[in-house]
């Protein structure tokens, strides 16, 4: 990224870099798709509220951010992080997905210590548990400083959001 910005700083090209946080939206892939599928089929465990913090952005807002950066001369040569500006816990994401699927949210959850025990069994499991229950939060203040404001939110999700 830095080499690209250095090379293009000597040209008249408008180059900016946008690093998206966890992206959700139609046809979501990766861990969010796996979680959604597991909740739908009934095998994904109810997550505990660990107060972890995760940044996310809806694909529509990411497109808006990309268009803003491409069109704003202040963005030339800059690196931005795209988020919806809110922090979400994994439990909130789990509950939102239950809502999308019209499934009731269980009143219980798998205790965190069971995830910790599983994580101690192998580095692969530890990595998965960390991705599921760990923090992954970023600031989009720099993007907001050029006028970006997310229009979609996790709490407003419906079946078209995944």
Tell where the protein language model's regions lie, with residue ranges.
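Flexible, glycine-rich beta-alpha linker
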Residues: 13-34
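Glycine-rich Rossmann NAD(P)(H)-binding loop
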Residues: 47-52, 80-87, 98-102, 132, ...
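C-terminal amphipathic/interface module of NAD(P)-dependent oxidoreductases
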Residues: 88, 127-162
């Amino acid at each position: 990224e830095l080499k690209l910005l250095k090379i293009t700083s000597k040209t008249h090209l408008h180059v900016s870099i946008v690093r998206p946080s966890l992206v959700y939206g139609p046809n979501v892939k990766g861990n969010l798709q796996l979680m959604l599928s597991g909740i739908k089929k009934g095998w994904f465990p109810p997550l505990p509220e660990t107060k972890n913090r995760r940044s996310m952005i809806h694909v529509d807002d990411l497109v808006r951010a990309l268009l803003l950066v491409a069109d704003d001369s202040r963005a030339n040569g800059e690196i931005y992080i795209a988020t919806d500006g809110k922090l979400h816990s994994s439990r909130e994401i789990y509950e939102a997905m239950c809502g999308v699927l019209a499934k009731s949210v269980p009143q219980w959850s798998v205790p965190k210590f069971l995830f910790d025990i599983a994580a101690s069994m192998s580095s692969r499991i530890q990595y998965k548990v960390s991705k599921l229950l760990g923090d992954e939060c970023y600031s989009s203040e720099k993007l907001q400083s050029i006028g970006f404001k997310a229009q979609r939110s996790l709490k407003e999700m419906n079946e078209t959001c995944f």
